[in-house]
UniProtKB/Swiss-Prot annotation:
Pathway: Amino-acid biosynthesis; L-histidine biosynthesis; L-histidine from 5-phospho-alpha-D-ribose 1-diphosphate: step 2/9
Principal subcellular localisation of the protein: cytoplasm
CDD domains named among the record's database cross-references: NTP-PPase_HisIE_like
Organism in which the protein naturally occurs: Methanococcus maripaludis (strain C5 / ATCC BAA-1333)
Keyword Ribosomal protein part of the UniProt annotation: no
GO cellular component, one term: cytoplasm
Record-given protein name: Phosphoribosyl-ATP pyrophosphatase
Gene name of the encoded protein: hisE
């Protein structure tokens, strides 16, 4: 299984099942608007960290912060009810 798909599936499962102590549960369990706002703040924060790492030409930090950015973007997508398959289809459309 593709590692990104596996991570996305785990995020979706945690949003649904709400296991105690889960970071995903922590940032997605407020009322929908507040949760989405929190997630959006994290996406913005992580995007800024990727930019700073890139400006410093720090490959290790770019990779680390990009993983955080992709993870939080996946949380936002899953919280918004967007499936991995829908996202994949959008990428396929763009490959033409």
């Amino acid at each position: 299984m593709n590692v990104l798909k596996e991570v996305y599936s785990t995020i979706e499962k945690r949003i649904q099942e709400k296991p105690e102590g889960s970071y995903v549960v922590k940032i997605t369990t407020d009322d929908k608007k507040t949760a989405v706002n929190k997630i959006c703040e994290k996406v913005g924060e992580e995007a800024a960290e990727v930019i700073l790492a890139a400006k410093d030409n720090n490959k290790a930090e770019i990779i680390y912060e990009s993983a955080d950015l992709i993870f939080h973007t996946m949380v936002l997508l899953a919280k918004s009810g967007i499936t991995y398959e829908e996202l994949s289809e959008e990428f396929k459309k763009r490959m033409k």
